Amino acid sequence: MTRTRLSRRTMLTGTTALATLVAASREPLAQQTVSRSAAALSAPLPPRREFVIRGANVLSMDPNIGDFAAGDVHVRDGAIVAVAPRIDRTNVQIIEAGNMICMPGFVDTHWHLWTSALRPLMRVDNAERGYFPVSTRLGAHYTPQDSYANVRLGLAEALSAGATTVHNWAHNVRSPAHADAELRAQRDMGVRGRFSYGAAQGMPNEQPMDLAGLAQIQKQWMPNDGMLTLGICSRNIGVSQTALRGTISLDLVRQEWGGARKLRLPITLHTSGPSPIKLLEDAGLLGPDVQLVHPLLTTAEERQILKNRGVSYSIAPIGESGRPAKAGVIQLAEMLDAGVKVSISTDLTGTFNCDFFQCMRILYQQHQHRVGSRIPLTAKRLVQLGTFDGAVDLGIADRTGSLAPGKRADIILVRTGDINMAPMGDPYEALVMLAQPRNVDTVIVDGRILRRAGEFTALNYAQVLREATESAAALRERAGWPS
């Protein structure tokens, strides 16, 4: 199959666009419309074509369609037209997918993409160089172009791991121009997602977040073509003395959440440490527009509140499983048993990777260790958590999360003949217990083939990496961070 390659002219265009982006960061946001359009050229997206994925082991994640040991998926104009054992069409591209699993792309429901290039500065064996001190100190020195470069690097990793939707948990929005840069990066990379606008690192917890800037961003960016949605990420809430970035008062919560709700925007919140759920319930603040993150210390009463209010919970298995015992345990079993909506997320990639296969594996192993068969958990249920349930969490299950006619074509192909996968038995079991990101062969988002045969089809990854590396070096210098 012919793969799209960047010409020298395209690469020069991308370099010019980056310079335009840097200049644009110095302009008022209202003057950046032309600059934003030019910056999009730095990551040209492949066109949407009509094609049929042929002969794959299809896992639709739709109970009305089911699975096919050998099946086809027809895509046209970015949408799924049909899913069936055999689809015959003439004059369309055929993607041969024998010895591959065809499934919905993973939906990541919580990722601090702005920290992606800080990886060389973080360490797990040195508390002074852990995620919190590094991101807090360097976060204060971010420019819009740093935000752009970091988000693009993170989304490149997301695509390589089979994530087609990412919730960008942006808790370092230093200005509307920074938010604009992150949204541009999400759009330019062609990944579906939500951008949650948050307070800047280092902002005093008595100071309200920039609701006027949030409204400005909403006016500029929403509605769009359905690829991106908008929300807010709240700072920590309650009286916890362990929150490393402190907490905000309930009065400020009412002000900020009320401002978001006036704009009809969803809200997301970390709940590390003592749970604020009862506090929020007593204040009348919980609802189906709220997503919580890190279910580690909830009570049975709180889980019933979450179910009744329609609140969802995002689990970040890799990071959460490495926390000290006093921080709690991943309460997947308790959440499922209570009927709370649950999804999976990466959290950050400073000290680990985007790897949904590992996330599912950790959840299964911890579940078996804690509760065994008392609360059944199947491999298929875990794959559902990583795909359809993530779309439910983000409120976009009408367009993604499963393979069904009318939905947008967010699809991945996973090779089953690779040495770590073959010979394959049950496909769900293989995905959860055996698969790795390197097995992801093809990634399709909204009908655009962004990766094929394990390679980007159009993105100049070397450029993305170079810009992110330069950003990290510049941030370290501006912050006076030791090498």
State where each predicted segment sits.
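Active-site microenvironment of metallo-dependent hydrolases
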Residues: 2-71, 76-79, 86, 384-483
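Metal-coordinating catalytic core of metallo-dependent amide/deamination hydrolases
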Residues: 42, 177-304
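Active-site gating loops and adjacent loop-to-helix segments of metal-dependent hydrolytic enzymes
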Residues: 117-147, 240-243, 274-289, 307-313, ...
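Alpha-helical scaffold segments that flank or form the walls of functional sites
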Residues: 119-191, 215-224, 469-471
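A conserved active-site cap/scaffold subdomain adjacent to cofactor or substrate pockets
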Residues: 315, 322-331, 340
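His/Asp/Glu-enriched, well-ordered alpha-helical/loop segment
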Residues: 333-419, 434-437
